[in-house]
Swiss-Prot record:
It catalyses: alpha-D-glucose 1-phosphate + ATP + H(+) = ADP-alpha-D-glucose + diphosphate. This is Glucose-1-phosphate adenylyltransferase large subunit. One of its GO terms (biological process) is glycogen biosynthetic process. One of its GO terms (cellular component) is amyloplast. Its EC number is 2.7.7.27. The lineage of its organism: Eukaryota, Viridiplantae, Streptophyta, Embryophyta, Tracheophyta. Pathway: Glycan biosynthesis; starch biosynthesis. Disulfide bonds: none annotated.
Amino acid sequence: GVLILSGDHLYRMDYMDFVQSHRQRDAGISICCLPIDGSRASDFGLMKIDDTGRVISFSEKPRGADLKEMEEAEKKPYIASMGVYIFKKEILLNLLRWRFPTANDFGSEIIPAAAREINVKAYLFNDYWEDIGTIKSFFEANLALAEQPSKFSFYDASKPMYTSRRNLPPSMISGSKITDSIISHGCFLDKCRVEHSVVGIRSRIGSNVHLKDTVMLGADFYETDMERGDQLAEGKVPIGIGENTSIQNCIIDKNARIGKNVTIANAEGVQEADRASEGFHIRSGITVVLKNSVIADGLVI
């Protein structure tokens, strides 16, 4: 069989259980799925399944009347596709080469048609899973990691998560107050306040900075003290967040330079804005400071 995964999901799963289920039920295609409530139903591919677990209908991100048709019953959850599939190799090759040679998407093009003629089985996954393919979902999933108890944990010793080795030193935190937050390696925090936020590697946060409900992705490199001093002397902004700055409900991308006395709060509640020339966008009410951008001293967003 061929296992197909998506790259923008957060979950922990033993694929062997999924593979065993696929083999035991002699499925042509198996779809990993999970129950969700009606408020999120139109964001996912939804399935109808029979008593044997066979998928008898599939609709990718349905709305309106199509959404009503996909509801199992008034009090039962929707069954949503996770975008994780196993195909018998010969079935996959036949679908891609002959049936759908121009198709670009499994969920919206291949699976709905295949469900009508191939033995497609649903495999129920009952653990944590989150699609982080949008700005809003990425933001919320990151902040949820800082909550206690967290729905998803990177600290399960029996099921460790592996990432790139960076050989960074521990973070240096001086005179700061940090609550319900995650601070990565190699950071410098000086007399700041960090609430319900995630702070990425090599981040620099200056004195009297207030960070709240913010995902700061950090930096790819360090600037030396001399480089930072020269930039400040020339009126430029070093990487990190300058002193007396307040930021909330924000994603700060890598290598961003945010000056002193900046306020990022979106006080007017703008939902969507494209301000790339000024170094930021607003998506779903969340301010996104762009990678390598410069936010000048004193700017209010």
